[in-house]
Structure formats: C-alpha cells, structure tokens
Amino acid sequence: MEDINLTIFSDDALPHAVVVDDYVIAIKRNPNGTFLEPHQMYDRYTQEFLQGKARDVLRQNGRDGYKLIIPEALSTGIIRYENKTKGAQSEVELENQLRSSIRHQRVKPRMDEAHRKLQIELRGGQILLHPRIAESIEFSIISKENATCSHTPVNCAYEVLLSGGINVGTGTCYDLSSRLKLRVIGDVDRHRRSMQNVLGRVIHTGDPKIINRVNQIGSQQFIDRAIGPDKFELKREIFDRLKALDVDVRKVIREEEASAELDEMGRRWMRDQNVNIVNDIIQSLVKKGSRSEKLAHRNEQGMQARFRRTIATNLRDQRQGKEVLNIRGTRGQPEEKKFAAVLLMTGCDIVERAIWSNEETAILRGLYAYAHDKLGCVYRAMKKDFVWSIRPTYTDRCAGVCDRKRTIMVREDYFDLQREENDSVYKWIITEWDKNDVIISAKNGYLYSKYSGEDEDDILVHEIDDRLYTAMIDRILINGWIEKEGLSQIIKEEVRLESFDFTKDAYVDEAGFLVLPEYYDRVIASNIYDCKFKISRVSITSSSNDDPWDKKTADSIIDEQCLWKIPLPNIIDVRPCFRGDLLTSNSQEYSKRFSGIIDELKKDKEIYDDFIPVQEGVRPCVQGHVCRYAFYRQKLTIFTILKRYYPIERILELTDEEDYEYNLYLDKECYKKESLILNLRSIFSLICFLIDFGYEGREITRGEDEYLKIFNEINYGGHARKEAINKYFPQFYQRLMRVRTSENIEDLLPLAFYQALLLSDPCTDNSEKSSHPLILFCQDKVRVVPIRTATQERGLPLLCCIHIFKFHPGLQMRKKELEDDIKKTLPAIFDYWIELEMKRLDTGDRLRTRAQMVELYYSTNCGGSYETLNFVFPIVHPNKGFIACVISSKGGMGALNEDDVRRRFRRIQSSIQGIFSISIDEEMEIQLHHSGNIQARILEKVFFEHKWHIVQVKLNGKIFENHELITKLMN
C-alpha cells in the first residue's frame, strides 16, 4: 500500500460499510460540528479523567473500566530490535525503562464488533481505528501558551509534583467523631485549691470535680459533629475541659454502603450461624477500610487470610469457650452490634493487640471503622455491653487501660476541613526556626544536640533517650539491621512526636472528665526538626476550601521550602498547592502561594535570566515559571545539603579556604552550576551529578537517557548494583567500599550519596513497614538512627531523610576516629544498604498515569488546552520506520502536534519518516499539516448524494504494511 486514506464524515445516514469498513481510520464528527468541553469528557470512551479538587489528583482512586496502555512500548521495542541486530541486546534494561516510566495512560475504549473497529472519543467526535493501528495510540493534552508561557518538557511540571516540590502542609486537626454524641452531665471545677509558688505564679492543685450536675437526660445539653453556630460556645467549653460528659452512639439516617452490607450479613448470621458469608465480610471490610491516599500494604493478603481462617471458626461457634455464644446471646443489643463485636474480637485476636483507626491494612481499618459505627467507644462498649475485655496476653499493654477510656476523636485532614467560622477543632501548631539565624562555620559544621534555649524550663524537649539508643545498638550487634519502627523508638517517651496519636490519647474517662494527654497545649521543641510543636484547641477563622494556601485557622501554612524538615505524617497534612477543580472548562486562578514563588523568582539574580521574563500585567506561567523554579529550588536545597559531605580535598578545591561561614537554610552556593541544576529532570539525575561533580571531577551533566539507564541499573539492578556503581562512578565506588571498615568520620561520608541514590525515586513502593539506618552527626558522638520512609504514602523517600542529612561534620573533625559502637555496627549497616531491594510501584499505579490529567489542570491556569490522539503507520520499504498521524480537537496547531510527536519518539527520531496532523475545527473546517517525505491533501467525495472528506497521504514510494508491529517488537 503506497498511500493511506482516512475518512472524515458527520452524516449519520452514511452506511458504515461505505465510510468506515474499508478504511483503516475513520473520523466521525459530532453533529453540526459541535465540540464537547473538557468537563463533558468525564466517563466517556477516551482517556481517564477525574473529578474533584485539583489538590487531590494523586490521592483519588482510578475509575473502573479503564485499561492501561504503554505508549513508550513502541520506542522501547524499536530500540530493542536495533540493539538485537547489533548484538547488544539487554532485555532487563528495556523492561526497566518501561516499568520506570511516568507516561503510561488509562483508556476506556469501545469495540465496534460489527465493523471491527476500536472506537475512541475526542472532544470533536469519534475516532474509529483498526485494532492493529490502535496498539500504538497515545493521548496528549496540549496546553495553549499565553504571552509569557513556556510549556516545554524541560519545565518538569509533572516531575516536580511527584517529588513534592510544590507541596504545602500544616498541622493536622482532630474533631468529634461523626458517630458519637456528647451529653453534658455537669460543669467541671478543675482545681480544688490555688496557691502561689516562690516566683509568685499561681499553681492549681487537687483533682477536678463535677459541679452543677444534670441527671435528667432530657435536660442535658449535647453536641455532635452537625452542630450549628448556636452551640459553638458549648463545644469550646467542652474542648477546654469545662464540662463533664457522657458519650452516646449517634444514629444515622442512612448507613454508607459497606456498613449497610455488613449489617445485612450480621442479621443473616444471627438467623443462621452456618451461612457462608466469610468472603463477603472480607470484601466489605476492605471496602470500608480502603483509603484512596494509602498504598495497599504488602501484608494485606496475608492479613485477610489470617482473618478468614479465624472468623470462619468464630461464626460457626467452633471456637473454644463461649465468648461468641455469649455475645450473640446478650439481651437488649441490636443484631448488628453483636456482629460487629464478634468481628472486632476476631481482629484483635489475630494480631494479639487492640486495633485502631490507623491500622496499616485496609481490612483492619475497615474492621475498626465498622465496630466504631456500631459500638461507638469500641473497647469501653465491649466491656460494658458484652463483658469482653482486652486480653492480658495481648502485646500492647492495653488490658485494663483502653477499655476504661471512651475515645471520641477522629483525625480531620486540614485541607478537607469544611467548618463554619468560630467552630472549634484541636490542631497541631508548628513554628519553624528563623532561617536567618542559623549561621554555620565550615570548620565546625552543624551537629545535632538537644534543644536548649531561654524557655527550656517551660517547654518539653524532643531528645534521644540514651537508654533506648543503647538497647537498639545491642540489637543491631546481635541481629543486624532489622528495625521496623522509626525514630520514635529511640526518643524519650513523653515527647515522641513521630508516634503521637491524639485519637488514642484524648478520651472521656469513667467519671465523665475529658482527659487530654500530657503534651496537650505544651510546646515541644525539637532540634531534629528545627521546629516547635503544640497541639491546642483553635477556632476556625475561614471556611474557604479552594486554595490550599488559604488559612482556615490563625496559624500559618508551611511552604514547600520548609516542609522537607518535618517528615511527620502522623501530625502533618500535606497537599500539592493546586487551587480549584481538577476537571473544568473554565479558566482558573492559581494558588496565592504561586504568586509568592514568582515574586521570589524575580529576586533570584543567579537564575532569573534562564527564565522567560515575567511581564507586568501578564499572568506568569505555572509550568514555565512556578513549577520550573520550585523544582530548581528543591534540587538546589538537596545540592547544598549533600555538597557538605564531599571529600575534604574536593571542598578545599572548590572553596580555596577552610574557615568560612554559610547560612544553613539560605545557602545557594552551587559553584556556578545553577543552569545545570535547573535543567536536570529528576532528583536521581541531581544525585548522579552530585557524585560526578564531587568524586569524578565531571563538570557537565550526562544525558537524561543515560541517567535513566544508571537509575535502573543501580536502584533495581539487584546483584549487579555494585558493578553498575563501579562502571559509572569508579572513584566514588572505591571510597564507598571503604565505608564498611571506616576508621574516621571522613570514611563514612560517601554513604550519604549512595543512600540518596536509592531514595530518589518518587515511584518507590512505600507500602512495607521498615526503617533505614542513617548516620546522625551529634555534638557528643556519631549515632545511627532509624528513619521510616515506608509510610504507605506515595512520595519521594529522600524527603523523609534530608532533615537528618542537614547535620554534617565540620572540616576540622573529618579525621576524628569513630567510637567503638559505630565501628561495630557499620558492617551490619553497610550490608543492609548494599543488599537493600528497592521496590517500585506497579506500572498501572496512579503516579505513572496522571501526567495528562495534571497537564489539563495546568492549562486552566494559562490559555486552555486541546487534546490529540497520535498513532503510527508502519513502513516496511524501502527503509523500516513509520509515519505518525495526529488527530487533534478544536484549536489544534500542526506545529505543536508535530513537536508532541517528536517528544514522544525522541529516542527513535530516525524511525520517523513523516508526520501528518489533522485538526478538526469548528463549522466543519479541517486543518491539515504534514512534514517529512510525504504529501497530504484533503479530498471531497460525493457518493449517491452523500458527501464526506478523505485525507489522502501519499507515501512517495514507501510501503505501509507490517501489521502487529508492537507485538512483534516486544516478543
């Protein structure tokens, strides 16, 4: 076949046999040339679009019915074929390239069985493709540029989102559970006596007591989550512990789906204990416990299997003893409540401890949530209503304690908080140190020591517990590195910020007093995080829910430049600073924080000239200005922290002096490498450049394809990892191998760069509970500390570690001999890191498939967008290659479409023998663009009074054939 013909029609009266069946591609326009708006493409036969707040783009689950496609398979297959002909085939390398891509897509196609065509929708109509052509498709969202825009891949607008470079955060919130109601049974006189101490301060002593008791329920005031402004003052008094309380389960009009399913199963079980509902129970519990922002835990299937075995026994009364029988026979309790009690008891028994709302597996989270729905304060209700107590044999020391507490709080994500002004919540308030105050001498470095300030007598100090630290070192010497918990395991118990859980620590006791933890309303100062923390009752000052940068309480939002210092997911909520909706046809204002970033860019003289100038009165570009600059600053921060670990001779070579000062947080010295750092496309590439620059003497960057190859060989190369490091970084490798037997601090330092390499993939699978050993340089000694990166949250693991890397030795202590405990543990630590198996997210994970959705959002901040579908026609003669075709919707521009195709096939440019682009515009107009050694024209065809168009592409001697191209290339 020496030419290609495509049809374009809009007449429904045309028989498909005439305009579709005999053509490889047919385009059916919408009636009257109409176009759908972006929001109208939701849930159609096209690429996956999501609705909701833009800030949740990486938190939403994917929609059912969409299938994964891998557009890069064609490029990878051709490279594989070319390498095979050269005898340089590497199956593992090519597989890794596909698995590490972040450009996969999810599509919902429709198969027209009668006409053997795959039907896909664009805004302007339907594309009907032969299945052999459809295997090469890729969708693209093309953002239209305004006057100062630059929408090029070098902006890394999606990469900065994945790396957390435009995230903001703030302390999380807590409020009364929606399933509970608090009744006021009296006032609280908190202090029996008052006296003055020697400093003249008033000290309150004695236990609180209840006064003005109200015994009749009908006369008691109450609050629940649904209160209005008339009860805000009462809620404030309750949260301030001025009221005595009783707690009831709140009835709801309609249960959510999973709870309703479990209720029905419970009623069936009460009638027949042999009913086969085990699989249905598990399915509903997992549904109830699933959280869109959480990765599925590695042990999810194992936990479900354990639960399946035990619940099957319990439901059939085959359990030893009469606990299930007694629960089922309890009088005066609803059937659903009895069922929930049996499920809860089963869950606790299989893990041998009490379970809670923050469990790592979905089945246990769902189990607790269902029990909470039915029982309210679950362990108190189990003891009071079913005479079941937490077992003394459990491992959590909860027996006799937790079942006396009525826990009433739930965590509320700050960014999802929708409360009226003057309402109250509990909130973590976080205050960072003044960045201008931290001036460091290069000779002395920045070493960790516990906080000491003028206010240290009035606050709690977050610090390492020497006894717990010594116990951990002893375990390492015996077992190697097998630590699962993070830093909290070596921190003093009363200040363990890393493991505080206010939902467990705040409760109503048996007497009716609201009990808050010892750390409540106390400042906790931490030099590890360079911040002060306090949880207090706060008032809502704004109900705004559009811009994450808008404050809802009096305290501040933490910007992207400070967030890396505080990797505490248990007390901090984090979101991309995306304002507005994800899927909309309207232009949107970007976040106020982005305006601040642009102002900071204009003041940054070292790098501003590398950007398109910001024009007065013209809105700057989110991709070209905000994302690019935010990513640059994130990379610069990592560069300036890790450069302090360079060999001493390299530092002296770069600085020409040993005694100089720098600001720990405002240091921008990167030895005139600003432009190189700006253009690096990933954090991994940055770490590679740091090693090249510091150890190999390399002054320029490598190509991004080479960085990708290094990334896959080192991070996912298994046993070949050491050989890969030696191949690409030979000087660094020699120093790294000496870490295991380090004698002094200088010998230790290369380990930090190796750790950074392994932790620099934002698509790492963080689902398995574990911690990594990092080196913490302290004033009194060098310590090894456990840091958790596996938090079941998607994100860059390195951001959980940079706050430890910021502590670094000064130049004068580089030759200081290491203490014996570190020397003895180093072999175990080094072996752990060398053998560490990094696991990547699945090819279909949302981080790998949301690039186009994010591009669509970015376009609403600029000039809008249009969409394209591109695919290829294989050429077999005279030279193998392909012709690329692009079909675009209203506003499509041929030159931009061609650029997008060349972006897709950048690694196989020589295989492109021609490109033609068809833009379907309004009022039945068709735009045609072509390049390369082909010719294209639009023909008008009339057949039995029907009229339509044909796009004819002359191949100039080339022969279109080679069906099943990708299938053959990948086999």
UniProtKB/Swiss-Prot annotation:
Alphabetized UniProt keyword annotations: Capsid protein, Inner capsid protein, Virion
Gene Ontology MF term list: structural molecule activity
Subcellular location: Virion
Highest taxon above the source species: Viruses
InterPro entries found in the cross-reference section: Capsid_VP2_Orbivir
Single GO cellular component term: viral inner capsid
Family assignment from sequence similarity: Belongs to the orbivirus VP2 family.
Described purpose of this protein according to its UniProt entry: The VP2 protein is one of the two proteins (with VP5) which constitute the virus particle outer capsid. It is the major target of the host immunogenic response.
Listed name of the protein: Outer capsid protein VP2
Organism for this UniProt entry: Epizootic hemorrhagic disease virus 1
